[in-house]
Amino acid sequence: VVMNRKNLTAAVLAGLAGAAGIVGSAQAVNINPDGLGQVLIYPYYTVNGGNTTVLSVVNTTDYAKAVKVRFKEGKNSREVLDFNLYLSPYDVWTASIRNVDGTPTMKTADNSCTVPYIYGNDNDGNQAFLPWAMNDTGVADEYGPISRATEGYFEMIEMGVVTDDTEGSATSATHVDGMMDTCDNLVAAWSDPDDLDPDDNGYWYDDFLVDIDAPMGGLFGGAAVVNVQAGTMYTYDAKAINGFAESENPNFVPLHQPPGTSAPSLA
């Protein structure tokens, strides 16, 4: 399958405008030619043919940010990996996608906070793509092996600015001398250790909006498809979209959502 990256970006942008009911509005979502935005669309990744895809996202602001990271396979745009990324001010997060024994797998050696904490897991920063969303649709031609996910696209959505208003979340998300030792605080914020005891719930488990302000934009990203054996590298900048979430809009819906869910959505 050869994915048309320009058509994909145009289709997503049209869908955003239509869903928001702002077609023709001066405040409509728009692609920022400067590459900075609230939403980043990376139109293509592949691990086929010996290729590896490397990627990065940059927080160009002096605020900590909560970002939804979502990978979708190329056949029917089913989710294959979804997690939350918490960026320090002026942070850069990097990762790669490669083929590991037939399974597309993301690897990161970056200690920026994610929930779940992929860098700090017991698998050397590796996270295999998952087939669950491809197996529960009830539509026969949408079933298939994880090899469907060897190419696709991914998106990053700013869910909000992280603050220290009550729980010190921004401090937990911030590097100190290049190191992170507080990501467990953010993982715990989303956790429910004991279903029978509501008093031990994490603060985000109970209230998504604790220490979260409206998105402000300022994300920048890019990716490259690299084939070491062939000696090739194809690079691109992510398409940056502004106007996705306007806190002044009376219909504004807060975007900070749990990891592993379909919200917030560009659909």
Segments (PLM) and residue ranges:
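Short beta-strand and strand-turn-strand segments in soluble, beta-rich domains
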Residues: 70-83
